[in-house]
């Protein structure tokens, strides 16, 4: 329901002056790729390596290949899409700017619609996103559910919210396939995904975000002392690969030719 409600909010020109606009998703992931390379290159330059560093060397290529494929895949979903918004409407990419709102030719028929229609297949579907959605931001009441902390709200692809929420849950439950499919089904009963949105979700799950986080934390922290739990986290990622790959395989099969 959160995303359905956010899709009703029209873009305002004054947002251009704030942090509600963010760069393309693929550019953020490309930056993460460079950070992984930087950490790996540093580790390779060391003559004596710690247990954590040996784990990185042993698993790096597998995860980095996933990262490259994910970035390229997201970029190819909406090639050349511009993310500059115009005031007053919902996602509509003209090629020069993005207008948020229904298409002009359908305006009369859609004026009474509660939720704006999905954008055309070659347009990037940009709407307001929570930006940091996980289980800690969901409050369950006796007769209501509330979402809190919107300090990272931005204009972007709403599927990224779904990914963040699901990834945390899936990691905690060993990438349980039935659980993942149940969450996807619950989401789509309220807001069905377009094929390219499902493809984007697949590539976001393919991207090794937790692996990147471990390498980036290592590179920016005190490398003389690495907590044992960091090494355990890397090993845990490797141990979960089989279950994670099964979930990715099923997700990819449902992408209807978009990946």
Predicted regions and their residues:
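Conserved kinase catalytic-core helix
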Residues: 1-17
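ATP-dependent phospho-/nucleotidyl transfer catalytic cores
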Residues: 14-90, 97-128, 182
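Conserved catalytic-loop position in the HRD/HxD motif
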Residues: 132
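Catalytic activation segment of kinase domains across protein kinase-like and atypical kinase folds
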Residues: 136-162
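Active-site activation/catalytic loop segments of kinase-like enzymes and analogous catalytic loops
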Residues: 159-192, 205-224
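Helix N-cap / loop-to-helix initiation motif
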Residues: 193-197
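ATP/Mg2+ or Mg2+-diphosphate-binding catalytic cores
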Residues: 212-259
């Amino acid at each position: 329901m959160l995303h359905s409600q956010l899709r009703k909010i029209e873009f305002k020109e004054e947002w251009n002056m704030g942090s509600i606009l963010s760069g393309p998703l693929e550019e953020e992931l490309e930056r993460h790729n460079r950070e992984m390379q930087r950490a790996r290159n540093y580790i390779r330059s060391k003559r004596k390596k710690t247990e954590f560093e040996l784990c990185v060397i042993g698993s790096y290529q597998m995860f980095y290949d996933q990262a490259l494929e994910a970035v390229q895949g997201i970029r190819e979903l909406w090639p050349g899409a511009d993310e500059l918004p115009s005031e007053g409407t919902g996602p509509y990419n003209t090629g020069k700017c993005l207008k948020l709102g229904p298409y002009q030719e359908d305006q009369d028929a859609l004026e009474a619609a509660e939720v704006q229609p999905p954008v055309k297949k070659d347009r990037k579907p940009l709407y307001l996103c929570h930006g940091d959605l996980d289980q800690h931001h969901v409050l369950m009441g006796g007769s209501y559910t509330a979402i809190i902390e919107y300090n990272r709200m931005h204009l972007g692809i709403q599927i990224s919210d779904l990914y963040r929420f699901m990834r945390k849950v899936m990691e905690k439950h060993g990438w349980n396939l039935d659980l993942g499919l149940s969450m996807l089904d619950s989401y789509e009963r309220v807001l069905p995904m377009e094929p390219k949105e499902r493809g984007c979700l697949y590539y976001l799950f393919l991207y090794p975000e937790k692996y990147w986080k471990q390498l980036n934390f290592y590179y920016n922290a005190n490398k003389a002392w690495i907590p044992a739990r960091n090494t355990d986290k890397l090993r845990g990622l490797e141990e979960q690969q089989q279950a994670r790959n099964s979930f990715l395989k099923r997700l990819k099969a449902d992408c209807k030719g978009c990946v």
